[in-house]
Amino acid sequence: MSTLSQQLSQLGGGSTVDRTWKLKQHSKSLIYEPQVAQDQDFSFIHAVGVEGLRDLVSLDSRFAQFENNLFSDTSIDVDRYVQTQEQNDLLDKAISAFLSLIGPYLMLSPAVKALEWLVRRFHVNQMNAEQLLLCVLPYYDQDIYLRVADVIIKLPPLFVFLNKSKSAAQNPPRNLLIRAFSADMRLFELITEYIVGQTTTKTSYQRQLSFWSQFAIYGLVADKADPERMLEIYLPALAKLVVTIDTDCQIAAYMVLTVLGNKMPLNKEVFNALVETIAANWTQKAIKSGILCITQMYQQKQEPEVLPTSVMTALNKAGFQPSDVVALSQKYKMALFTLGYCMALLRNPDAANFKGLEEIISNTQFGSNESTFLMRYIVDWALAKETNTSVAALAAPVIAKWVTRGETVPELDQLELKLQTVFTEAAVEEMEVEEIQEDVDVESLVEQAKKAASQTTTYFSTKTSENYAELSKIFVQLIERGYTMDKFVSMFSSDIASLTFFARIWASPSPLLARLAAVEAAKTIITAAGEADFQNLIPYTCIALSDASQRVRKAAASFAEVLKSKQNKKPIWGVEKIYTNDCSYLGSGDVTVLLNALSLEECILDESFVIRQVSDMISKKKGYKSAFSTAVLAYLGSHAVSQEIIAIRTSLLTLVTSSEEPIVPTTKVVEPLYINPPNDLAYITELIRTVTDKTGIKFLESLIKNDSPIYDEVCDIVTQRLVKLWPTLKGDAHLGLFRFFVDLSLDKDVPFDSLDVLAHVDVPTKVFISLLDDCKVEQNTTSMDAPSDESTKRRRRSSSSTVRNLLQGKLHHIAERNLRKVSLVLELLVASKTTDDALLGPLFTQLGEILTLGTDSNLPIDYCQSLLADVLLNIIRANQHDGASIDRDIRVDIVVSAIRTASNAQIQNKYLLLVAELATVAPTLVLHSVMPIFTFMGANTLRQDDDFSVHVIEQTVARIVPCLAGNTDKVDMLLVSFVTAFPHIPQHRRVKLFGELVRALDASGTKDALATLLFLFAQKSAELKTARKTSEVSAIAKFCDSLFKLFDASKQLAVVLPYVTLVQELYAIIATDPKTKEKEKKTRRQIFLQVDKELEVSPIDFLVVLLESRILPLQAGLVQSPEALKIAENVLTVLIESQYPELLNVILSLLPLPLFVTVAGRLGSSVYKTVLARFSSGSIEEEDTKASDTLLESLHSLLKSTTDTGDLVLLLQIVETVASGFPKCSDALLVTCAGEAVAQLKNSDDDVFIQAVSVLSSLCLRLGARMIGLFPATISSVLARDSSDNLIALSVLALFATFIKRLPSFMVSSLPKIFEFALKCPADTDTRKQLFVVCVETMDSRVVLQTLCDSWKFVEGFENARLFADTLDLAVAEADKKQIHSKADSLITLCLEAFDSSLKLEANTAARVQNLFIKCLIAIVLKLNDKTFRPLFVKIVDWNTPERSTLLFKIVCRLQENLKSIVTSYYGYIIDLALEILNKASAITPALQRNILSSLYSSFRFDREEFWNNEERFTKISDALGAQFPYLTKVAPENSKLLIKAVVALCELASEDQKKQLNDMMIKLLRQAPLYGSRCFAALFNNVGEEFLPFLPQLVPQIAELLESEDEKVESAVRAELIPAVEEVLGESLDRYLA
């Protein structure tokens, strides 16, 4: 037979699928959990949405439009499932507008609230899911997306790729979206259309556009992209976005267009249309992005195209300048746009455009093909017929930029002729742009030429420059017109005039064709000339052979062949005629060698070949004789000196300086040119290259000193030349030049950077030594004053007269200049990284000078001192292995003085590092000065808190401390210095610093450094404690603990004995009489700080505390290190005989168990018991069985013999610890110890009793059944103990719990006594409950249930009753059905006993107890079947008495509510009792009436068997209920609602006749109890409605009568409740029936 609970579970399955679906749909919420959302009504949700909308309106007034539709009050009643299609279309339109507008605010709480209303009321998550997703998709990586995705029941088809992330409640990864957008063009088209629509309605926003552009670009670069389909989607959308006035829209479109233009092929029409559309529509803020877009779109072109006029107009209007092109080109690849822009500039060829063009070409990095294309384009434009000469001339500077970079095009020669110029920057700058008259005839030009040519004898003079300019111009025009050169040659008065003219043409900037014609004309003249040596033309022939044009070089080679044919002829042509000065000449043999060496064929092929050949000649390479080289150099140099035309002289100097290596005679050859050279950079450059010796260097110095327009460029060239010359100079030259540059650097008026030269050359050590000697103060001051003996005195001597002198204006200036000079020399030393030890003496001398200067004046010497320290450090470190050879130059006393006088901490640190390095090189020298160093460190450096200072201290300690090996006094002084400085050392630096100090002392062989240091801190701590400086004492203790941690166990234990020795010495000194103390003061060690008075705190206590804080690590160290263990044994050997028991105990507590037992055996029992306290911590891990057994035997003996309660507690704690911490110890010994613990249960001391109970609990867990023999004595002793003390009660409860948990079967007989103890003891409820829980979970349920049934008599008070009820409830739940069936009668009896006991309590307490046991009763009943429970229910009914009736019906009501229709028929056992009570109105109480009515209401409500439809039963109960209405008015009006609910529930069960019977009864009651009767009728119409309409004719007259009632409450109830209820069912007003 099934249980009642199983029957109950089969009920209530009446919910339809439709209702479940609607509930699930209603529970979908963006804000609330489903279980909360399903209970919310639409009014509440609407209020939330309206609140959100109001906040949105405050942010954006456009939201106000939705107050009257989506969020109106009438929207609460809108149901889109019953609306017409037209109504739903309007609703969708409003929803679409709202979703379009809400996008930017989705991260705000008001937006979520407003959207909540649309989801809950209009189901946008179903009906508008696609648009909702489009709205929220830009937030795909935010929490709002997860919320929206969660409420969408089914994703639209295009968004099914989001299903996985939706199911996992995770944001979709970026890669998923990229793949989806790339693979499904329909999806991307949908999103693109949505974005375009947003821009049309001006509701787009930055995040949305960024999202779209980002994934649009990903779609473009995807491998699966279909170009045609992409263009079909992209171009219309982009065209719409570009023309909007929204900046963000435009920028998003530009981003996509940039990629589109480079990814997809666009035809010319589409491309131009896009570019022009961009330019025509960009907003002010989008201009920069638009321009960048256009530049990148042009990169997809195959070749450059001129920018359209409309685009250029838009660019100009936007303020786009050529400088902007340059700036962009440095960041982006945009060469094709730049070319198109440059080409477009030529459309309007004015000066401004060409200036911009020049700026672009000068500052933009073009590729070779691009550069050639643009150059050819500009040249073709300039050569075009429609381009006149004056306009074409504007392009000359632009073309010159290319030519100077070595670029050219074939058409350039024609342009040079057209413009009558050569394309070099210099020539173009001098060129006058004027219109050349094309209509001038040749005859006129010839006449002008004849006139000009006849006026000059040589054109190598500056006096002929004007004539040359006029004639060269005519010459070019005649060439352009094809005039015969023979005729032109005949115009000159002499061959000197003609040849110098033509040589000047080809040797200076001229058009190519002019240069070519000049060479050929000269060849014609030479060929026709008579016998002569034309060697004066050889230098100019070399210039022609180095021409950039191969045609010119070929002509020059032919000219040279003619010269060869004229060699060895007499006389020399042009002597004293072509120059105003005479020059050197070559012998005929040398001329032959020179001409043959030129290798003309190679010259034709390589323009630089002739330069290399001349270089070989003058540098004596390739076997040329010295005399020949010298002659050639003198020959070329003299021509350069004699030539007055600067441009030609520059070319000639190029030949002179052709050698890469400096040639000494060069300077002498061209020396005349060093006087007042013109400010021509090319000329000065070549002139500087001629410098090779002292004379030339003087020229370079003059260039540096004299300002000029090209000063900066000249200085750069001078620097390069000096760096190159430096290795070839001799010592004196080095020193002189070095002094010049140092003095120059001191001159603030000269901007030349001397250090730039000196930093790039290797300066000999001797030069530095000489310079340092120059820097001595006495050297500089004696030049003004007579020498005196005082100046020869040593560094540290100064006098008042010296100070006065230094403070005098002039001498002060000299001292300041001297200091700057020293600094400069030292900077160079640092830069050169010179490490020659020869510098040590001068440097230390200079350091002494600087210190004296700083002491005797107010000059700043910090920088100079710092540099000196750096140099000295470099030298000492480089020469560490040569200490014996350099220690004679070392002056440690000066270094110490520098440390003590320095005002800057960093400088002090550097010199401390220097001392540290010196300690390695010369330890003996350092030792004499070590204490002043450490005294200074203690007062200064240790207080610094920077990393460099810490490094300095560490290095100083590491290097200097080894010098102290064996010197105890100095070690003591060192340690005292550090301890004294301790308060000033930054806290986070202390531990590392002192650790390094100890390690350094240990490494140097100093013994007991750590012990001495701790001893000093102990004295310091005692002193501070006396002064009541608690925080400082704490700081020392914390520091010493941290310092101690740095060392291993061996080192820590090794501290003890030397520390104790020091303490003993201290106490011995303190005990000495004052006179002896005074005598021994000078010989006493400095570490004994406090010897004049007794110490309030013993240093031993300091060590004890320190060791106690390290017990666990030390114990581990002893186990791991045999060395540490040996040290511990030695320490114990000494301490056993000492007077320091505390220290002895600490050391003993560190020992491993075997050693501990061995050592302890040698001590007295009192010490043994004290030391045993360490085992009470429970943290020992030991597996030595023999040692643990020995310990247990000792403990057992002590437990027997000890009577002191404190010792007993301690021993019992140790037994407990051993039992839990030593798993391998003997169980038999533990049992003997347990017996002793049981014996101690009878001890009168509570602490001993409690500890004994605790020990027995622990031993029970360990031994289990082995303790069976001790159980009777244990239980009896424990229960016999007075349990009024809370601690005792708690310990006993814990013991019982352990016994029950470990040995449940042995505790059955003791369980009643345990329950009694638990219910009576004063322990807190939670602890006792834990015991009951253990019992229920561990022991047999029958035993527990029976024990509970027998234990109710021990329950007193509510807390115990609740504890008992909770235990019973738990026990019932733990038991199975069979066990409950077997104890059912006893359990019901137990509940009835509890109910009886509750009746004796105060009302509220009684109700609480009754509720607890009714709950237990129901739990019991649920595990019973009907056959078992029915007799028990009868037993409960039989238990009833008049006093118990209220409780009985309360029980019945709760049973009805929990068991529902299963127990409806059970009401038959109590119906008579209920009727009897209800019909005796005088005997019923309000509580009894309430419980009866509640039970009836529950029974009516769950009646599924027509139990109450029985005529007799129905009549009796309806009459009884009717009888209660008059009673309500008199006694219990508070039960009226319950009575009415019961009547309505009965009516819902009734048949037609029974309803009529009930109606008749209620009509009568309207007269007896009109108020409650009318309310009852109102409830009936509200619930059974139409079924009561047939009885309306009977009711209407009664209503009319009640409306006339004098009782206002009755009239009000009828109007407010009854009439509306009737009208609601009737469907019309009652007025016409009541009229």
Curated annotation (Swiss-Prot):
Chain's gene name: UTP10
Renumbered residue ranges of the record's region Disordered: 781-803
Record field: transmembrane: 1141-1161, 1288-1308
Localization of this protein: Nucleus, Nucleolus; Membrane
Classification via SMART domains: BP28CT
Subunit comment: Component of the ribosomal small subunit (SSU) processome.
Keywords annotated in UniProt: Membrane, Nucleus, Ribonucleoprotein, Ribosome biogenesis, rRNA processing, Transmembrane, Transmembrane helix
Species of provenance: Yarrowia lipolytica (strain CLIB 122 / E 150) (Yeast)
Record-given protein name: U3 small nucleolar RNA-associated protein 10
GO molecular function, one term: snoRNA binding
